[in-house]
């Protein structure tokens, strides 16, 4: 069985993340979307909210499950869930440099786990959770962020930030 892990903070999940998930689901028998928890990182959404939003926007995928991992190398988590692949998105040259280094480290730790890089289409190449959150504030932000987020996430962002 070909099982893969696609990990991130998903704070919030974007249409770029969903593109990655759609592509990876087609490549593997099972995809585990793993929400990483970093206690040193301030997140907009709690881990429970991120998991719930991911489950909602991926409910149509039968070969997918959402999980959480904390305080361990991704490759060790992948090994613990029986995954033989790690899927990573490459949007920029700096993403590539970082992910290439991590791929070599992962290979040193678990040579049996392959890291696979996916390059998103142009319309998602600049989309990140950080970018979306950075657009919030100026008049009209609600219309601007809509194109980058799945509808349930967009509604959650509206309810969160419209109250402020």
From Swiss-Prot:
Pathway given in the UniProt record: Cofactor biosynthesis; coenzyme A biosynthesis; CoA from (R)-pantothenate: step 4/5
Similarity remark: Belongs to the bacterial CoaD family.
Name of the gene: coaD
GO biological process: coenzyme A biosynthetic process
Swiss-Prot/TrEMBL keywords: ATP-binding, Coenzyme A biosynthesis, Cytoplasm, Magnesium, Nucleotide-binding, Nucleotidyltransferase, Transferase
Job description of the protein: Reversibly transfers an adenylyl group from ATP to 4'-phosphopantetheine, yielding dephospho-CoA (dPCoA) and pyrophosphate.
Keyword set includes Plastid: no
Enzyme Commission designation: 2.7.7.3
Recorded GO CC terms: cytoplasm
Designated name of the protein: Phosphopantetheine adenylyltransferase
Alphabetized Pfam families for the sequence: CTP_transf_like
Cofactor: Mg(2+)
Positions annotated to bind substrate: 9, 41, 74, 88
GO MF terms, alphabetically ordered: ATP binding; pantetheine-phosphate adenylyltransferase activity
Summary of subunit composition and partner proteins: Homohexamer.
Site, Transition state stabilizer: residue positions: 17
Reactions the enzyme catalyzes: (R)-4'-phosphopantetheine + ATP + H(+) = 3'-dephospho-CoA + diphosphate
Species of the source: Chromobacterium violaceum (strain ATCC 12472 / DSM 30191 / JCM 1249 / CCUG 213 / NBRC 12614 / NCIMB 9131 / NCTC 9757 / MK)
Binding-site list for ATP: 9-10, 17, 89-91, 99, 124-130
Organism phylogeny: Bacteria, Pseudomonadati, Pseudomonadota, Betaproteobacteria, Neisseriales
Cell location: Cytoplasm
Tagged with keyword Ribosomal protein: no
